[in-house]
Amino acid sequence: MKQVQVAVVGASGYTGQELLRILLNHRGVKLVCATSRQYAGQPLWEVFPRFRQVPGSGLKFTDSDVEAIAATGAEVAFLALPHGVAASYARGLVDRGVRVIDLSADFRLDSPDVYEEYYGNPHPDTALMQEAVYGLPEWRREEIARARIVASPGCYPTSILLPLIPLFRAGMLEPEDVVACSGSGVSGAGRKASIPLLFCECNESFHAYGVPKHRHLSEIEQELSHAAGETVVMSFTPHLIPVNTGICSTITAKVKKGADPESVGRLLEEAYAAAPFVRLLGRNQPADTKNVTRTNCVDIGWAYDPRTNRVILMSAEDNVVKGAGGQAVQSFNIMCGFDETEGLWVL
């Protein structure tokens, strides 16, 4: 098997750690660069002892700029950086011939105005923003394969878009009557030290946040509007739940007049028959985060409530795997001509 030289930029957070875990076990990857200002000079295994004696884990973190990253010979770079920071690295790397998979929000949106509305600053590179491909592999395989830059979707959007896109594409759902409630593990808030994220603050606690306009709402509405061919407006309420990883989303949507709610199962099956990481549980089968932990899978169940004429969709994923690092590697596989599942069947 050919090997692609890979860099992970911003490799010391939870998403970066997950990328390293997957890439160190990927037969088609030669890891040539991992950056971290905090841990520069230390080998991967010393910072993350779980990697001790794993081949490749002796690579040392560096505090590298764009030029130094490109000089390592990296052909593909994963950016696990905060929004606003990632864009400057992306432009420099793409201009040097390095293909980029960005896990921040910098290139997920089509509109610079929407980006500024949700993220509070003007977009730093609108030209590259227009070029970027939204990297939801189940729906963008051909575009991902050709892309110079892929914007890997957010964790919440992945759990909501995959159940809804087939139904909106079929014209089944009302575009202004969608409600999603999601719960995410604490790792979704990142690895930084923060009082609200301390164990005694999070444990035995369950609460909403980011109400009423969480940043991920922007990309969810954007992609659902593309699928529906009309503007979709929805209500989205995320919650913090006291687990390390996992997202569980419950989505309800009103069925359009004349549409057949009994076709939900068929539409999902047709959409994901060739999708290795989408597991359809069937009617009246709720998804459970414990069944997707440490996997790149999304489990989806569904139901119909005739009293309210609403479809109920239930999904579960691991927020740092399918919701972040795993999905990014899935796009990498497509970009580089590997089997889509390479390195990702770790259960």
From Swiss-Prot:
UniProt organism field: Akkermansia muciniphila (strain ATCC BAA-835 / DSM 22959 / JCM 33894 / BCRC 81048 / CCUG 64013 / CIP 107961 / Muc)
Major subcellular location class: cytoplasm
Claim: Oxidoreductase is one of the keywords in the record: yes
The keyword Amino-acid biosynthesis is annotated on this UniProt entry: yes
Single GO cellular component term: cytoplasm
One GO molecular-function entry: N-acetyl-gamma-glutamyl-phosphate reductase activity
Gene Ontology BP, a term: L-arginine biosynthetic process
E.C. numbers: 1.2.1.38
Family matches, as InterPro entries: AGPR_AS (IPR023013), AGPR_type-1 (IPR000706), NAD(P)-bd_dom_sf (IPR036291), NAGSA_dehydrogenase (IPR050085), Semialdehyde_DH_NAD-bd (IPR000534)
Gene: argC
Catalytic reaction(s) noted: N-acetyl-L-glutamate 5-semialdehyde + phosphate + NADP(+) = N-acetyl-L-glutamyl 5-phosphate + NADPH + H(+)
Keywords of this entry: Amino-acid biosynthesis, Arginine biosynthesis, Cytoplasm, NADP, Oxidoreductase
PROSITE patterns for the chain: ARGC
Protein name per its UniProtKB record: N-acetyl-gamma-glutamyl-phosphate reductase
Subcellular location: Cytoplasm
Any Pfam family the entry gives: Semialdhyde_dh
